Amino acid sequence: MSSITRDSQPALRAGVRLQHDRTRDQWVLLAPERVVELDEIALVVAQRYDGTRSLAQIAQELAAEFDADAADIEADVIELTATLQQKRLLRL
């Protein structure tokens, strides 16, 4: 497994997609034989996993959008990314 840094450029793995589950009224990551529910914060991060933006860039965008501390946002983004990578939902 690749190590995650602020320069990592994650994207959803093949076969994983972001979708709104109408039954649950919840955004989820759908993967073969599993569903991962996303809270509002995880959703705005996951929407930016495009394989071109670094985690530092994603954190800067979110810090500007939500008027929050960039260092705190970056730490949270890296933590979420690590969790999703451990679940094999992302490629770096």
Curated annotation (Swiss-Prot):
Domain of life: Bacteria
Keyword annotations of the record: PQQ biosynthesis
GO MF term (any one): quinone binding
Pathway(s) the chain acts in: Cofactor biosynthesis; pyrroloquinoline quinone biosynthesis
InterPro entries named in the record: PQQD (IPR008792), PqqD_bac (IPR022479), PqqD_sf (IPR041881)
Single biological process term from Gene Ontology: pyrroloquinoline quinone biosynthetic process
The keyword Transferase is assigned to this record: no
Entry keyword Secreted: no
Family indicated by similarity: Belongs to the PqqD family.
Function summary: Functions as a PqqA binding protein and presents PqqA to PqqE, in the pyrroloquinoline quinone (PQQ) biosynthetic pathway.
Subunit structure comment from the entry: Monomer. Interacts with PqqE.
HAMAP family, per database record: PQQ_syn_PqqD
Name of the molecule in the record: PqqA binding protein
